[in-house]
Amino acid sequence: CAASCAPGMGDAPEVNGRRYFGSLALPAGQVFRFALGSEPELRDPGIMSGQSDGRFARMLFEGLTTADERTLEPRPGQAYRWETSRDGLVYTFHLRPSLVWADGTPLTARDFLYSWRRVLDPAAASRNASLLYAIRGAEDYNKGVAQDALALGLAAPDDSTFVVTLANPTAYFLFLTNYYTFMPVPRHVVEAWGQRWTLPKHLVGNGAFRW
């Protein structure tokens, strides 16, 4: 009678159409704890590359898009909509209104502009900088062939609009914008604390959780 005699079987709630036997009650203090498997090597989404690093980043940061939980298709994240030019080269992202960092500082398109340029800066030594090579001028800038960050195909014409120009049409580009390397970092915190900005007492994200 394993099924019929299981305690609380009839009271189990349904989650996404399936009966769930865990607890749906919020933990005390709304603190979420989970196992990473290993300690993150790095906590800077623009620099990191490890699996545990990425899981950590997804808890604290959010990019322009997210992934549909069933299809993995791009869905709105920090950008609530976007347009693509007819030639597939220009992506215009429109950020959600009133976005803020976890410390209450406004988050704007200029944060994405700063963050993506930072990933491509050779001095940052980002392990995943090549993921941005689809962007016009990105590879030459990252490899030191070109020196002018203003020549990159990145622009923030106003606080809520972020424009990306690609070197060539890239069908999977929207999928990339959900990857942690493309997530924004808080310029005001990075510049205030340098490499120490990812310490627990300094780290500020824009995602669902605070650390």
PLM ranges: what are they?
Residues 69, 138, 148-151, 160, ...:
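Gly/Pro-rich hinge or "lid" segments in bacterial periplasmic/extracellular proteins
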Residues 6-9:
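Bacterial signal peptide processing site
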Residues 1-3:
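Sec-dependent bacterial lipoprotein signal peptides
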Residues 21-33, 205:
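Immediate post-signal peptide segment of exported/extracytoplasmic ligand-binding proteins
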